[in-house]
Amino acid sequence: MDTVNNLPSATVDEIPEGAPVLDVREQNEWDAGHIEGAQHLPLSQLAERAEEVPLDQDVYVICRSGGRSLRATAYLAQYGYDPVNVLGGMGAWADAGKPIVSETGEAARVL
């Protein structure tokens, strides 16, 4: 694990199997393709719904490329959470050949 802006960060290969993943992308991005088992909480709703994020373990925060997840990681860290920003986001996840699922009935893809 590394740090970006003094916040914990990890590559997609460093995410432990079964670790909680928080996807902060918007609904249409989530619907097109996401990590199976991830929790969806758009960055635009994070302040109102932060209590839905587990407090008792590291949570790996992901977006499309890493910008929104870095902002979400900074926000959550202020309030006692243990967030880890996922470097490269869903783009890196897909590039690594890791599986994604779709909610649309079409082939999963990263928007």
Where are these regions (language model features)?
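Rhodanese-like catalytic fold shared by cysteine-dependent sulfurtransferases
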Residues: 1-20, 26-58, 67-111
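Short, surface-exposed ligand- or partner-binding patches at beta-edge/loop junctions that are enriched
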Residues: 62
